[in-house]
Amino acid sequence: MTSTSNLIEQVIEAWQNMQAKTPLVQCITNSVAANYTANVLLASGASPAMIDNPYEAESFTKISSALSINLGTPTSEQMQAMQISAKTAQLNNIPWVLDPVGYGPILAWRSQMTDELLQFKPSVIRGNASEISTLAGNQVQSKGVDSTLSSDQAYQQAYALLAHADCIAISGESDYILSNEIDAVIQVNGGSPLQPKITATGCALGALIAAYSAVATPTIAALSAHVHFAIAGKLAANQAQTMGSFSSIFMDYIHMLDDNLIEQYADIKLLNIQA
C-alpha cells in the first residue's frame, strides 16, 4: 500500500540515483527558458543538451537518457524536431516529458502541434492549471501562458489525460500529481509565491521531471522534481524576501538538496482515491 513515508523514501532514492548517473537530458525548449533550464539541470545533478535542430534530433534523442519538450516559443523547425524526437523516444523506450505551454484556442497552432505530440505517449504531461484543464477538454480562459485556474480545481478535471500519458503533473500554489501507477492523487506543498515571478521556473521544472524520469518511474520522477522545487523554494523564501536574492538562493538550494533535506522538508499528502 502506498504511503507518504514510502513515497519520500522513493524520492530520496531517485535523487541519489540522479547524482550517481548524471542523466543526459535533451531539451527542446523555448528561447526564454533555455539558459535557466540548463542551469537548473546542472545544479540538480543532470546533464542538459539543448538540441532542437530537426537534422540532429533523431540521432541525439537515441543517445539521451530522457527528453523534455516545451512549447513556450515554438518555431517551425523546433516543431519538426519535437515530432522527430518524441517519435524516436517512443520507439526506443526513452522517457519524455511534454510541457504544453500556452495550450488553448488563443495559441491555436502550437495547440494543434501539442495534440499531435500526444500520439507519441509522453511519460509525463506537466503544466499549470489552465494548460492542463484545457488540454483535458475544458474551456478555461488563460492569461497568456499564465494560469487563471487554481491547481486544486484542475486536478479533478485532468483524469482524461491519463489515457495519453503515465502521469499528469499540475503546478500551482500546491502541486498535484495524477498517475496510472497509483490510485491516489499526490499533493505536494511548499515552495514560495516568488517562484512564479521568476521567468522559466515552470519550464525548468518540466525538464527536471525529465531528468528524474531517467532514474525513476514517471510518477516518482514527477513527485521528485516537484519536491525538489518545493523544498528549494521554501528554504530560499526563509532567507530572502525580494526577487533578486530569492532567485539566487533558490538556485543554491536546487544544488544543495540532499537526502536529509528531503526527509526533513518534503511535504506531501495522498488525496482522494480514484474510483
From Swiss-Prot:
Binding site for ATP: 126, 171
InterPro entries the UniProt entry points to: Hyethyz_kinase, Ribokinase-like
UniProt catalytic activity: 5-(2-hydroxyethyl)-4-methylthiazole + ATP = 4-methyl-5-(2-phosphooxyethyl)-thiazole + ADP + H(+)
Highest taxon, organism lineage: Bacteria
Keyword flag Nucleotide-binding: yes
SUPFAM superfamilies: Ribokinase-like
Source organism (scientific name): Acinetobacter baumannii (strain ACICU)
Annotated gene: thiM
Positions that bind substrate: 50, 200
Family annotation (Pfam families): HK
Record's keyword terms, sorted: ATP-binding, Kinase, Magnesium, Metal-binding, Nucleotide-binding, Thiamine biosynthesis, Transferase
Pathway: Cofactor biosynthesis; thiamine diphosphate biosynthesis; 4-methyl-5-(2-phosphoethyl)-thiazole from 5-(2-hydroxyethyl)-4-methylthiazole: step 1/1
Cited function: Catalyzes the phosphorylation of the hydroxyl group of 4-methyl-5-beta-hydroxyethylthiazole (THZ).
Protein name (Swiss-Prot/TrEMBL): Hydroxyethylthiazole kinase
Family (UniProt): Belongs to the Thz kinase family.
GO biological process: thiamine biosynthetic process; thiamine diphosphate biosynthetic process
Enzyme Commission number(s): 2.7.1.50
NCBIfam families xref list: PRK09355.1 (NF006830)
Cofactor(s) needed for function: Mg(2+)
Enzyme class name: transferase
Entry GO MF terms: ATP binding; hydroxyethylthiazole kinase activity; magnesium ion binding
